[in-house]
């Protein structure tokens, strides 16, 4: 292994959790009982869990030490003051509202910033984000660059907004009818693709001319900053911390799930500069999350997430993080497995369209591929395609995204390169026998965010 290309873990392992591989017969039974939905599996039946990087991270000794000084006062916790000051320092925002996770922040922002019938422009949808926008009367418009919808195109900063699309939307709908621009850094469903600093700057310049606010989905902003440092001219010698600070200088606020780049198990926030919107958010957070000084988090969790934000911006940490994901992607590409290119920040996305060419999108190829991967090796992954996209709120028809993928999401500081080898070998084996992957049909379809709890069975 080339250690300059794939650096060793920049940490020592102090505590371990045993895992076991149950038999193939047991995995087949578990998958059937789960309705061929990996979300419904019991974690004890999973060998390597790549369902998500959200809240599945390993905390550091410093974070665990911080947990011991949790101030669990109902109001005015010292841990909240530490978290608030950390967010203001690192991200540069004037005001912060804590939430139990990113979804809580999405709910707050959508509630205070969208009027029914207004448009929300963004660089590709995300499941829960679009749900909250539509729930509050918003209409999502995808303005990501066209290349992001093609898994095979390998170009940098594939998550960029197409500024011409944004300008056209403003001309057609009117600036007053656009609630805000939602800029995700990175873009999850495009494959964890980053946004360039130049693009953030261009979006800011255009929206400022029209008085339109820009809010970031900051969930994996540190990963985005690494790509800027690695690939964008003028940033090679700039620290991750300074890159992050500049990124958010081109925004009016951000929602964030701290369960990713905060390297913790729970927590999030809404950060905002506008005084009036901040006041509204503080009123609503009491209803949905808790007091504005904890937002659904314990004091110990707030201490841990503040420490985690600082650790995430250490170069050695984020370099290993990105390179470990890239290692898995490189192994699959070398074997000819079709994936979303380039490899993004938090996951490797299998291109289920090319992986399962014998299945129509309405036969749920990504869902079936994820189920097959678990049966083959005990590796849990996540469908990110037509099932996740859901149905059109007006027509009831399935949204049909151009990308039909299976996400292999790498938790932070949890698995080693050897685990990545196990995953790669299983995926490669499946690809050699891809014709055995069978079509699925719904047996239970929830009305909202169906991918979480839906159940399926084989359709043939």
UniProtKB/Swiss-Prot annotation:
Enzyme class name: lyase
Enzyme Commission designation: 4.1.99.2
Cofactor dependency: pyridoxal 5'-phosphate
Residue numbers bearing the N6-(pyridoxal phosphate)lysine modification: 260
Gene3D superfamilies: Aspartate Aminotransferase, domain 1, Type I PLP-dependent aspartate aminotransferase-like (Major domain)
Keywords: Lyase, Pyridoxal phosphate
Catalytic reaction annotation: L-tyrosine + H2O = phenol + pyruvate + NH4(+)
GO biological process: tyrosine metabolic process
GO molecular function annotation: tyrosine phenol-lyase activity
Listed NCBIfam families: PRK13238.1, tyr_phenol_ly
Subunit-structure text: Homotetramer.
HAMAP family: Tyr_phenol_lyase
PANTHER family with a match to the protein in the record: BETA-ELIMINATING LYASE-LIKE PROTEIN-RELATED (PTHR32325), TRYPTOPHANASE (PTHR32325:SF4)
Family affiliation: Belongs to the beta-eliminating lyase family.
Protein name: Tyrosine phenol-lyase
Source species of the chain: Clostridium tetani (strain Massachusetts / E88)
């Amino acid at each position: 292994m080339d250690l300059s290309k794939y650096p060793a873990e920049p940490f020592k392992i102090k505590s371990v959790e045993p895992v076991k591989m149950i038999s193939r017969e047991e995995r087949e039974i578990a998958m059937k009982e789960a309705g061929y939905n990996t979300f419904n599996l019991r974690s004890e039946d999973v060998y390597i869990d790549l369902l998500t990087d959200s809240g599945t991270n390993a905390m550091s000794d410093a974070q665990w030490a911080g947990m011991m000084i949790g101030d669990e006062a109902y109001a005015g916790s010292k841990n909240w003051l530490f978290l608030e000051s950390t967010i203001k320092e690192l991200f540069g925002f004037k005001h912060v509202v804590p939430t139990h996770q990113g979804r809580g922040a999405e709910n707050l922002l959508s509630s205070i910033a969208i009027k029914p019938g207004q448009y929300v422009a963004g660089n590709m949808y995300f499941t829960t984000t679009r749900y909250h926008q539509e729930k509050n009367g918003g209409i999502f418009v995808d303005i990501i660059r066209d290349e992001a919808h093609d898994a095979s195109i390998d170009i940098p900063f594939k998550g960029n907004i197409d500024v011409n699309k944004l300008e056209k939307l403003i001309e057609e709908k009117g600036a007053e009818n656009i609630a805000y621009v939602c800029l995700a850094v990175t873009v999850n469903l495009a494959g964890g693709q980053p946004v360039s600093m130049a693009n953030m700057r261009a979006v800011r310049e255009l929206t400022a001319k029209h008085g339109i606010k820009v809010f970031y989905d900051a969930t994996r902003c540190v990963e985005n900053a690494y790509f800027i440092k690695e690939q964008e001219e003028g940033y090679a010698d700039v620290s991750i911390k300074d890159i992050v600070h500049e990124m958010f200088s081109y925004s009016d606020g951000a929602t964030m799930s701290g369960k990713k780049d905060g390297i913790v198990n729970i927590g999030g926030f809404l950060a905002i500069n506008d005084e009036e919107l901040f006041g509204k958010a503080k009123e609503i957070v009491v209803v949905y999350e808790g007091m504005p000084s904890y937002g659904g988090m314990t004091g110990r969790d707030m201490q841990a997430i503040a420490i985690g934000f600082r650790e995430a911006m250490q170069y050695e940490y984020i370099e290993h993080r990105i390179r470990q994901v890239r290692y898995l992607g490189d192994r699959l590409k070398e074997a000819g497995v079709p994936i979303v290119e380039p490899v993004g920040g938090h996951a490797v996305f299998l291109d289920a369209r090319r992986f399962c060419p014998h299945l129509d999108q309405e036969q749920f190829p990504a869902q079936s591929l994820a189920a097959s991967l678990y049966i083959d090796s005990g590796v849990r992954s996540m469908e990110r395609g037509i099932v996740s996209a859901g149905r059109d709120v007006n027509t009831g028809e399935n949204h049909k995204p151009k990308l039909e993928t299976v996400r292999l999401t790498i938790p932070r500081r949890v698995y080693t390169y050897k685990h990545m080898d196990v995953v790669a070998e299983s995926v490669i084996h499946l690809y050699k026998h891809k014709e055995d992957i069978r079509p699925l049909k719904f047996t239970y379809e929830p009305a909202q965010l169906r991918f979480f709890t839906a159940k399926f069975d084989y359709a043939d």
